Amino acid sequence: MSITAQSVYRDTGNFFRNQFMTILLVSLLCAFITVVLGHVFSPSDAQLAQLNDGVPVSGSSGLFDLVQNMSPEQQQILLQASAASTFSGLIGNAILAGGVILIIQLVSAGQRVSALRAIGASAPILPKLFILIFLTTLLVQIGIMLVVVPGIIMAILLALAPVMLVQDKMGIFASMRSSMRLTWANMRLVAPAVLSWLLAKTLLLLFASSFAALTPEIGAVLANTLSNLISAILLIYLFRLYMLIRQ
């Protein structure tokens, strides 16, 4: 059976339109969870203000130089802020991936689905999804730090791993290995979608500061919701593609 990207795009668009409100609510809930967790675990405003005290930003040649010029207390505050942002983002992404994939499974089985039901049904797989997304993010970030291109390649090769983990109940490393093999064999179908997703997320990041015109909290929720919707579209595409490849 010949699979064309155009047919998968069409199926993705139809599913997204038909389930838009449910996907929007899941995206909004995940964005809210991400922002709340980030706020809870982040340093206080007073602590964050200390980061600017006595640090010669203009004279620093790079990020590592800037960090080296910080006091141990400032470095600890920066580490806490970075860890809070990373942890809350990973939690939100894991819930989003689990929720969206469960929506697809439930709808495909002819069952009625709501945002809360999808998230609740995904609860048993969230720990494995969290670890998978953490490892994937780590590998992609390391690749981007090296020469950028390896990170993009890793993002493409591991794209199907969450779908395989949930749909086929694979282990974390088994899903990563299987994703690499299957994606490599179907690069022409996976790569354009992942690259479009990366481009859309980058463009959103460039305009993210404009959302803060509302209030920082509302702006963060809105930006995260839009980011989640972009990721949801990619997940729908990858799930549909994986089902067609398996046939």
UniProtKB/Swiss-Prot annotation:
Keywords: Cell inner membrane, Cell membrane, Membrane, Transmembrane, Transmembrane helix. One of its GO terms (cellular component) is plasma membrane. Its main location: membrane. It is found in: Cell inner membrane. The chain crosses the membrane at residues 20-40, 87-107, 118-140, 152-172, 187-209, 225-245. InterPro entries: UPF0259. It is a multi-pass membrane protein. The keyword Cell inner membrane applies. Belongs to the UPF0259 family. This is UPF0259 membrane protein YciC. It comes from Escherichia coli (strain 55989 / EAEC). The gene is yciC.
